[in-house]
């Protein structure tokens, strides 16, 4: 969690609104860009499925969900893993190393299972999972309470080989070069018979990385004095990470199953950032992290299911800083540690009441014990969350469907004690074959990371910057609404609105009384994102197939208590995403994809226009697709470089991050008719890892 971006702090904390998509997600391998939140940032109810007719349909309606045929959607796409597969869904983008749906946060689930693991650890696991195990993907813009999560959901459904005795597997290896070399190897095995399904996965990522940043600070004090600093920071990193998973399913009878899963993620990262210019500084960070997750699930053919989950996370790190910023040699040696234990239990029941009515209800309880320390300061935090919900589904003939639910939640910490109601409503209308009109409203609650509410301080930019925690940071309350129209099961238009009361963000602030810059999460009055998403296939001919996604977004962010610089800023920005496939021959495919976004804001930060263009050449020499070789180049024109500016009301902080294009090659071999299986993911979003 505590992978501190010291000399690139402003970059990391400012990408949340809509930083451009790093096409190769290179920052995830870089301990300096994987900062924690503080340190820089089902059973479907028995309603009939309605198939949307049309030419090569990619989506159908199932209950409250839009179900996408991922194997067809991914056809002729050089996608290696589940994370990249999700990014092919309409409206899905990557912002600040996180998946977004219509520029809003989204929860990824597997087989309808809500878990306690997410964020960077989830994405790391997704990248370790082969693509072909996905059967389809459900998209819910306003998830009902029976999913036991709130807000938008992408539910990956798996392929299961129940009743078939088989041993299947896959081996994968890749090398990528972006100034330095990085490598990834993984192996997967799946054994099934009439009663058992045993799934094993191991992946190993290792290598080095390099990039540099140009930083410019101009600081004006209330007494009239002013200071300016211009520096360049060279960042070198090395990382080793292991992902291990073992899943066991036992089929007692049809639709009657007990399953056990163990997930482990181990990482060791070392980073060095050396700055030169108006002052010199040297930063070294050593970080290790250990995550162990156990999950037990039980499901029955009469709609009852229950489960329990335990997650243990530990992350010690040490930071050494030397700096000549204030004309004297200063040094810091900071040791930090985080220990988190999380337990979760849940129950849920679904009934078919007849006459196209359905009823569902359930409960879940999560408790967390967080013992973290920095130097000689130790904090103990307990957090409890309990909820009850009830929901109903109804089919009014064959054209109109409705699902509504209500969840009551109790949230308790040493500071906050709150009861909250979360209503959800989803209405779907089918005017004629091939057309879907879907409307939904829902409410949600977002929680800060565990580390961001600690009263700890960390130094950055050679001692000029201070990253401080906020023990009084409160969860935010979010209201979401959407209206989606699907034409011929391929053309999609979606209006969306998100109103986040008390939404929290991290911004830089240059003090008016002393020579220091402070980073701190604070609650805004509100954060508003609303807009329109359009997606259409543009197939020129049999050998040239395209898709185009356009998103237009209105932003408004207001914070009336941000130090002595209250702000109320608005902005319109657009995103264009193109994907083109060129079928060169029976065994050869060229894929190109590009994205561009216009200027965006995050609080006092301006995020200039940028974009990227990627290309990949895939060769499948065998007719059964058991062997695949892919060569690619991401960010061909090196246009994803970040230029992030804070010049609001006398503030002056400018960061420019420069990375090289990425060249890579990968090889995949499958045996035994291997069909890749997805895994439920452990929610680590609040650990900041």
Predicted regions and their residues:
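N-terminal periplasmic accessory domains that precede
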Residues: 38, 49, 82-85, 122-124, ...
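Extracytoplasmic beta-strand/coil segments of soluble accessory domains associated
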Residues: 58, 83-118
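Short acidic/polar hinge/loop motifs at secondary-structure boundaries
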Residues: 115-142
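Transmembrane beta-barrel wall of Gram-negative outer-membrane proteins
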Residues: 180-208, 224-271, 290-294, 300-301, ...
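Face-selective signature of the C-terminal outer-membrane beta-barrel domain
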Residues: 196, 241-268, 282-423, 428-434, ...
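Outer-membrane beta-barrel signature, preferentially recognizing the C-terminal barrel domain
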Residues: 445-495, 499-501, 519-530, 536-539, ...
